[in-house]
Every structure is written in structure tokens, then in C-alpha cells.
Amino acid sequence: MENYTPHQARYFAEQINLKRSESTIEGLASAMSGVKVDLNPHQVDAALFALKSTLSNGALLADEVGLGKTVEAGLVLAQYWSERRRHILLIVPASLRMQWRAELSEKFFIDSIIMESATYNKRKKEEIPNPFDCTEKVVICSYNFAARRTAEIHSIPWDLVILDEAHKLRNVYKSSNVTGHKLKDALEKVNKKLLLTATPLQNNLMELYGLTSFIDDHVFGDAKTFREMYVTVANTDLRNKYLRKRLQNFCKRTLRSQVTEYVRYTNRIALLQEYEPSPDEENLYNGISDYLQNEHLYALPESQRNLITMVLRKLLASSSFAISGTLDSLIARLECLLKGYEKDLDLSDFDLFSEYTEENDENSPTNNHNDPRAERKKDYIGIQKELALLQRYANLAKGITSNAKGDNLLTALQQGFGKIAELGGQKKAVIFTESKRTQDYLFNLLSHNGYEGKIVFLNGVNNDSISKEIYSRWKKRHANDGTISGSRTADIKAAIVEEFKNEASILIGTEAASEGINLQFCSIIVNYDLPWNPQRIEQRIGRCHRYGQKNDVVVINFLNNKNAADKRVYELLDQKFKLFSGVFGSSDEVLGSVETGVDFEKRIAAIYQKCKTQEEIQHEFDELQKELAAQINTKIVAARQSILENFDEEVSIRLSDCQKNTISSLDTFSQWMYYFFLIHGAERVEPLDMWRFKYKSPDGTTKTYNLKWKEAETAGDIFLRKEAPFFKAWLAEAINAPLSPVNILFDTSKSKRKISFFDSHPHMKGLLSIDKMSYDGLGEEEHLVFTVTTKDKTKLDEDLINRLLEIPATITGPCQKESAAFSKQRSKNLYKQQTQIKKANKQYYLNECEKLDAYSEDLKNGLERDIKELRKEISVKKKAFKASTNLPLKEMLDLKDEINKLEKKRKEMQRDLYDKQDAIDDENDRLQEEIRKKLEGKIVTEHIMTISFEVV
């Protein structure tokens, strides 16, 4: 067995725990080493950009769709979390809350809490004064919920706030953007805001002003000045060049075409399965569609009429089984109304109903039930007629035992499996539906047609016997390997996905239950129900068509040939949004043109609701296509390319360097983890290879740990992270253990790794001192300062010192005494490190001063603009006066009085101008003084160890 010393354990513990500058790859390595993400250089580059300076109030990450902005933000979040800055808020669209929660848990091992009405009220009952005040978990909430709880959000000293789909805020400068204004005010004190959007600039340059001012009000002046300086200008090339310079420290955008060297994109291949419904199915569809178009309906609460109508249309298109159960709920409500009281509708079959309700609340905040007393006053005869009609449709639905679309699914799967076999993929397909009843129908249909025992499904509950059995086997299989999280929801999802990967051929998933899962081993996606929201379709396909997918992906869709509206919807999604074919899927311009997918869904629903003839349907969809075309502004696309995007060659060089440095830093960090585990674990640890060990814990169980997450998953090992409780305890033990100055003998013959340098310098002797310098000012950072001298004057750099301390060693006696020259060199090295910290701070200071000076100039230009406008007005009045010789004397005198008053006002404004300019300069000085105080900081030095050494 190899011997090591407590001094070596302390050294590696210090390196692992060291707070490096977070704007460097070395500083991010600690966070990167503990995540289950196959990192790409553009993601690391973006995270470093966002972390680069605590002086900056935040950043806008605007990579194209599909490049992993979630991972970029997750790295920033993980860095904050590892530094115990844990007041973190995520504001996202309601539809993405669960996906973010799953990503944080599965990839970054960070727990989160979704703050919604139920959670908020529960925490209030637990006597938590501010339910948002949480440091043991990341808080996730929707835009709408955040806007309703601004007082609570404002009162918390957030360390980091991340806003996904941040284009919702690009019009925050407009008074009509109520939600944006509320959030901006609520987050005004936050030091770091991270905005994520693939479409930062869609319609006009004022959107860039809105997003930048949301991050930092001290970048540009007011909206009017920005418009005058950057929007209404003749020389757009000069404008773009200047804007690019102003925004380069706040906005970062990478294109998919720039990362193809690192991210392998496979193709999407579309298969369309057309079908014709049976006469009964068509009668059911047309009958319920006509019913929903009635002006007054008693079964639908008026306050949610539009929302519920849209949901019913989706269930109607899904399957007769989906609408059948929902008709029963409508009937039950009408029967209760006849008895004089109200009953809630049960729409739980629609997977996303609660999410849709949350989104709907944004535009309908007072979404209350109808007053039962008002219900009783309604026309009982009308209610009875409606009840009879729905009972007739319910009976018709129950009489339909098979669906044409379902029968065609069998054909489509055969074609899909045939195609994927040609492409070299596995015989696996994921089928998406929005209805749980449709999911049950498909399970039974496929089980009776050759797929029995090969199907698994996800629906958010998974209480069926098959899922329970899969879950039970999974728990036994992973009983001792650290895979089980303890959360049934997360664990059963992991169990189902593992079963699908290793055993099953088909996964039937409802929408919400399938969020956050990665299925890159599957190459067929079946949209059994086709959502109207293009962003949701992109998310669905992205479950399989993502980084790590080795094969082209087949996307199967269904089209009812007898439904004119369905045809036009498919045409839009396929030809306009280009969702189903090609390498990249939908473009940012097109996805961005719909603003939010939910709004687009409502637009589609409105067409279904009001159009009764084919001519009306064609006209409305033609108008919608014109609207979408108008929203893609080619001039704005060109401006975005000029202002926000970098030359491919520049990006290529930067990403190449980032890739090399990331690999190097992660390998170094993993080696520190390896040697610390080996040294501190001593006889309890058996190394298997460079990244794997067997460890016998105090309770007698033996576990295999792996420092590489991918290899850990393949081998069934436990992924070792420095955040593991026992590992954190070991680090604390090593750092707190007292160390005496000693002499250490390093024996290269006992090392399993060949270190050529020390082999070529036998019997090297020397003295080594290690100090830790901590700086607390512009953020916190720590540096290890090495002072070393050797008897033969050989120079050892930090890398060689690191290699030296990896060699097995024993303590042989006391340390040799420090010479005066050595002490002097040690002081010199500490001073040099202090100078380097100040040098880095100087650059931050200059950047911030440049930003504030430009901001001040904007404000001054705004002041002068008002005087210029007044001068123009005076000039117009003077011309009118000269031309007024034919007017009566009184009117001429009145006009002259107006001119005199305006001249007087101009003189007053001119005098005020100097005072206001002085005030702006004073404010600039005050802000710069605040920065200077931050930069001064506090520097503390701690001596770690001094050893004399000999290498044999």
C-alpha cells in the first residue's frame, strides 16, 4: 500500500476548497466537476461571461435555440450554490417550471421548490413570514406569480435571479408592460440578474434597451434618448458599431453554425400519417365542435370559457376516449346546476390543465367561479336541453370502440421502425399525448397488437401495477449505489426511463410527466396529439433530438384529412415553423415571431371557435400567416447580426481555447479529488484506476466511486462529487488538522505514475512553503502562494510542486530551518500575488467607469435634446410671426408673447442644464466611489505549511 502524509492531504484539500476567481475556467472547475452534463465549450464560455465580474449587475445570454442556455445558467447557479450564496430565484414561464426543477436535480444535484399558490399558502401556515425566503432550495416561480408577489420578492437579498424566456421583458420600457415594470421594481436591488432568450431582438432596437435596462439602469440613459441616438439615425453601420461596443459586456450570443465542431447535429425526418375518421367519430367531432360554438353554455364556467373550450377541443382531437370521460364531467355539472348548486369540472385528464390555468391567470387575474345564486336564476329549460344534447354525445362517444387514428398508429410505427432500422437506430419510439385516457387507450391498443410487455409509460402518477413492478426492481438494483434520490416522483421517472432504455420498445408519455427527461437513445418521436404551441413541439422533439443523439430522428405526425383547420395548423407547423425536418428544427426568427407559444395557441383556438365554413377557415389562416410573415423583420435580423453576433473565426479561436482549458482544468481538479480520496481514505480505499476506487465505509459496506459521471453511469458506480456529505467532512478534517514543519521523503519508486522530471533529478532536496491569500472585496477569491528553493538551484513551478505532492511519501524528521533569503523570497511572492489581484481589479474598474461615463453622456444628451426641441418650436413660432402681417394686432401681440415666454423658458432651461449636468457628474462620481470602496477590499494571509523535502 502507498504511504502519504497529512501535509499532502492538507494540500489537496486546500486545492479542492480554494475559492478561485469565478471569472476563470479554473474557478469554475469545482462546479463543473460535480455536474452530470456533457459540457461544450460555448456553454462554459457563456457561464464565464455571466460570472466575469461582480461589478456587473448581470448578463443577457442569447444563444440560438438548442444550444443549452439552461446548462449555461445552471453552471452559474451551481457556482453560486457551491460558494453558499444560496438566495437564488428562477422566474420562468409556467410551462417550464417542472423542466427546470428536473434539470437542476438531475444534472446539477440542486434541490428546488416551485413557488405557486399551494406552496405559498402551505409555507404561510408553517409560520414562515416570507415564503420566498429559502436558502436550502432554489425558488422557482412563474412570471405571473412573481408579478403578484413583488413585495415579498423585493424584501429578500437575492444573490442571483435567473429569468428564462426573458424576451417577455423586452418591452419593459413601455408603460403598458405591467408585469415587466413590477418585476423590474421588485428586483431593483439584485446584484446579479441573468436573462435567457434566443430572441433578444425581434421587432425594433428599443427591445435591446428594454432588456439591458432591466439588468442595469446605468448602461443607457432614458428611452427617449436611446431612440434618438440609436433608432432614428441615418448611419446604421456607425450606430451598430457603437451599440456593439456598449453591449459587449452585457450580451453574449452564439450560433448553432459556430459550434458544429463540438456539437454533432443529426437530421430530423418527417413522416406524415394521414387518416380519415369513421362516420361516428366525424359526427362526434362535428357535434361537439358545433356545441362549443354556441354563444351561451351552462356547462362551462363563464370566467374560464375560452380556456376550457380550448382544452375540450384538444381532448376531442386526441381520442373519443379522452372526450368521453370529460363529457361525463360536463353532464355532472349541469345536473348539479339543476339541483341548485355548482360543481367544479374535472379536467385532470388533460395533462397540462393546471399549467394552462396558471398561464391564463396572467390575463384573467380574477378567475372566480360563478355565483351559484346567479346560476339558479338561469333558464332551467335551456340547461335541460344542453344536458340532453351532451348525454347524446356521451352515448355516441361510448359507442365508439376504436379510433381511426389509433389504427393508423400501428401502420405508422411499422414505417417508423423500418426507417430507423435503415438509419441504424434502435427499435424504440416515444409517443406523446396530452390525455391520460388516450394514454390508457394506446397502451391497450399496442398491447393487443404485438407490443405486450414492451411498453412503459409516464403520466405523473404511475400507480399502475407495471410501473410499480418496474420501480420495485429499480430500487433493488440501485439499493447501494447512491442512485436513489428519495423523491418518488423523480425516482419513478428515472426507473421508467431506465426500463425504456434497456428493455422496452415504446414509451407513452403525457406532456408534463415527460418534461426534463433525456431520451437521446431513442430516435422516433410520435406526436399522437399535435400541440398548437410550436415551442412545446420543439421541446418534445428535443427530448430525443439533442446532444448525444447518434442517429437521425424520425418525427411521426397524424393528420385528419377531413378537417380543414387541422390541415392548415399542420401546414403552419411544418412549412412555416419547419419543426419536423432539417438539422436544427425551427429558427429563432420564426419561434420568436409568436412571442409566446401560449398566445399562439389561443390564436389558433379562436379560429377553431369562430369559423364554421371551409372558406372562413382558409381566410383566417391566410391572415395568420401574413401576420407571422410581417413579424419577421429582415432589417432587424441584419441589425442583430451586426450588433450581437461575432465573426465565426473569432468564435472558433475562443471556443478552441476554452475547450482545451476546460479539459485541462477538470482533469487537474479530478486529480486533486483522486489523491485526496486516496490519502485521507487510507486503508479503506482501494484504487481501481485513475478515476475509480472501492471504498469500505465504517458500516462495513463496500461501494465503488467514480470521478467521471459518464463512466460511473456505464459501470454502475457512484459518481463522486465534492459535495458528498462524507467527502465534505473529510475535507474539513484535513483542513483543520494541525500541521508541524517536517521533513518529507518522496519515493518515486512507489508511485504508479511515472514523473520523468523527478526521475532525472535524483536526490533532489529543498524547502517548500505554502501560504493562502484571501481577498474579500470585489467578490471573494483565494490564492495559494508557493515559495520553494532547492539545494541544486533547480526551479520548481506550481505544476511540478503539484506533481511532487502526488508521490508517496513518509515523514522522516523535523523541517530544516528557513534562511533569511527564503523568508525574503516568501514575502516577495506574497506581495507579487497582491499586485496581481489589484491589476485584475484595475481592469474591472476601468470597464465600469467607461460604462458609467457613457451613461452620463446619454443623460446629458437627453437634457440638451429638450432644449433643442424648444429651440425648434421657437423657430417655428418666429417664422409664423414674420408671416403674420395680415393678422389683427392683438393676435400678433399674443403670438409675440408666446415667443417671449418660450425664450424665457429656454434661458431657464439653459441655466438649469449646467446644474443638472453637474448633478449627473456628481452622481457618476458617487457611483465610481462606491466601486473604489468595493475594490479596496480586505486581504488576509494564512500560512498553510512549511516542509523540507528529499526526492529518491
Residues covered by each model-derived region:
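SF2 helicase/translocase NTPase motor core
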Residues: 1-48, 52, 70-71, 81-179, ...
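C-terminal accessory region of SF2 helicases/translocases
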Residues: 2-9, 551-710, 714, 720-723, ...
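Conserved Helicase C-terminal RecA-like lobe
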Residues: 36, 265-277, 325-503, 652-701, ...
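Walker A/P-loop
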Residues: 56-76
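Inter-lobe coupling linker of SF2 helicases/translocases
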Residues: 129, 135, 139-158, 173-191, ...
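Conserved RecA-like P-loop NTPase helicase motor core
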Residues: 142, 452-566
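P-loop NTPase motor cores of the ASCE clade
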Residues: 335, 633, 637, 650-862, ...
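Amphipathic alpha-helical coiled-coil segments
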Residues: 901-921
